[in-house]
C-alpha cells in the first residue's frame, strides 16, 4: 500500500503471516469405478480405487493445506480404517480441512494443483474444477490453478494404471 502526503511518498506494509504447504497423492485406476477429480465427475470407463470417493486431486490439496500448518495429513484426520469416511465425498473432507485452518486463525490464499493422468483428457474439465473448488476454499476462481499433464505413456500413469497429483497451497493469517 502506498500513501502520498505533502508530496512525500510513503510506503506502508501490511504484515501477514504466510505459510506454504505441498501435497501429493496417488490412486490406482480400475474398470467400472467413478472418476472424481477436483470435485467433478469425469466421464470415464475407469475410476479410482479408494476408501472415499477417491478424488486424488482433493486429497493432495487437503495434504497441502494441512502441511502448511503442520497439521498432519488426511490419512491421520480421516483414516481409511474408519467406516465413517467410507465412500465420503472428498469435497466434505476439503471443507473440514478449510474449517480446521480457520480454527487456527488462517485462511486459504491460493492453491495450485497438477494432475498427471494419461486418459481421459482433462482440459475440458479444468475450469469446472476451479469453479467447484473456489467456494469451498473461500477464494476467487483466479486463486485456484488446476493443470493436467500426461507422462507421455511412461510409468504407471502412462500405462493407465493410476493417477498422481501434486498440490501446493498458501495459507494466510491476516
Residue ranges and their predicted role:
Residues 3-4, 9-12:
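Short, positively charged and aromatic/hydrophobic N-terminal segments
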Residues 17-127, 137:
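RNase III-family endoribonuclease catalytic core
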Residues 126-130, 159:
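Short, low-complexity, polybasic intrinsically disordered segments
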Residues 133:
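Glycine-rich, mobile lid/loop segments that gate access to catalytic sites or pores
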Residues 140-143:
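Short acidic capping loops at alpha-helix termini that bridge into adjacent secondary structure
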Residues 146-150:
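Pyridoxal 5′-phosphate
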Residues 153-155:
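Mobile acidic interaction elements
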Residues 157-174:
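C-terminal edge-of-domain segments
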Amino acid at each position: 500500500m502506498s500513501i502520498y502526503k505533502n508530496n512525500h511518498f510513503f510506503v506502508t506494509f501490511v504484515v501477514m503471516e504466510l505459510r506454504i504447504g505441498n501435497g501429493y497423492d496417488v490412486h490406482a485406476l480400475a474398470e467400472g469405478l467413478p472418476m472424481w477429480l477436483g470435485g467433478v465427475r469425469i466421464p470415464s470407463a475407469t475410476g479410482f480405487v479408494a476408501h472415499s470417493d477417491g478424488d486424488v486431486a482433493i486429497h493432495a490439496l487437503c495434504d497441502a493445506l494441512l502441511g502448511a500448518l503442520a497439521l498432519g495429513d488426511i490419512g491421520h484426520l480421516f483414516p481409511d480404517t474408519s467406516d465413517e469416511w467410507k465412500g465420503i465425498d472428498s469435497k466434505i473432507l476439503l471443507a473440514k480441512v478449510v474449517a480446521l485452518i480457520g480454527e487456527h486463525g488462517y485462511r486459504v490464499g491460493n492453491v495450485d494443483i497438477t494432475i498427471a493422468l494419461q486418459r481421459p483428457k482433462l482440459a475440458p474439465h479444468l475450469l469446472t474444477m476451479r469453479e467447484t473448488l473456489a467456494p469451498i476454499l473461500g477464494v476467487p476462481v483466479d486463486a485456484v490453478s488446476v493443470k493436467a499433464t500426461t507422462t507421455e505413456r511412461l510409468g504407471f500413469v502412462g500405462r493407465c494404471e493410476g493417477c498422481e497429483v501434486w498440490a501446493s497451497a498458501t495459507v494466510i493469517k491476516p
